[in-house]
Curated annotation (Swiss-Prot):
It comes from the Eukaryota. This is Protein ATP1B4. It comes from Gallus gallus. It is a single-pass type II membrane protein. Its function as a Na,K-ATPase beta-subunit will be lost in placental mammals. InterPro entries: Na/K_ATPase_sub_beta, Na/K_ATPase_sub_beta_sf. Keywords: Disulfide bond, Glycoprotein, Hydrogen ion transport, Ion transport, Membrane, Signal-anchor, Transmembrane, Transmembrane helix, Transport. Residues 14-41 have a biased composition (Basic and acidic residues).
Amino acid sequence: MEPGMEMNTASEGGTRRGPENKHEEKVQDPNRGEAETKAEMGNKTWADLAGEMKTFLWNPEERTCMGRTAKSWGLILLFYFIFYTCLAGMFAFCMYVMLLTLSPYTPTYRDRVSPPGVMIRPYLNGFTIAFNVSKPSTWQPYVDSMHQFLAAYDDKVQEEKNIECISGQYFIQGGNDSEEKKACQFKRSLLQNCSGIEDPTFGFSKGQPCILLKMNRIIGYRPGAGVPVNVDCKVQKGNESDLRSVDFYPGNGTFDLMYYPYYGKLTHVNYTSPLVAMHFTDVKRNSLVHIQCKLNGKGIINDVNSDRFLGRIIFTLSIGK
């Protein structure tokens, strides 16, 4: 082989090895860069990081706060102010339109309103009424609660605010929904022995307590379908002889129809719910007596076990000597 050819071959070989070396360098460069970057990051102190954070919060050279100039911050705040103002305005407008369709005097949908529940007075610490006849301090709170509750039923108050109505029929009042409705008188004297007039202790001092029962108010509701609803009481759990005698006032424990329907608190301002007083004149002493009092009448539901207040109420009497 001629010397010139050997030199060409050698030069060609060198040319071939050149790219291989360059490729090796290219492969090694990224690793070296990562190592150098890690080294640079590792060399930063907490002071350096704090300085960078300070510059981020306020850069005096570029006069920026968190990367934004005052003009940029002003524009973005103005954008969000306008955006949320429009959003709130749309929500308020939708609420306004919806409220225009609702009457403040009469509920729009009443087809699924259940019959009324009932409640008792006095109601202090739950549905257990316990006291000792010989210790006035045990029954005086119940007496005070009864007087406070019946203050709105005083005869003079009822005569001043309400009118006398025809018994035995619904008191239907026409006119606009916004017109103020009249209310029928319910005087506490109708409760007779349980009025607190003749006996200011409502029988508690004698071991013959009076319990008041009232129906919850439902706008437009007419109980009994033309027949007055009445109340009866019996022992709910235990011996029936534990409850030997109960007197009811007024009208043998009936809710007169003239107090219905109820038109709502906005128009029926002076309305006072009718009451039935239950005078427990003979109850077993020194024993817990579980009593159930319920409403009876057309359309009344009083047998739902999951709701102890729907058309009935269960409470406990404990009368000590």
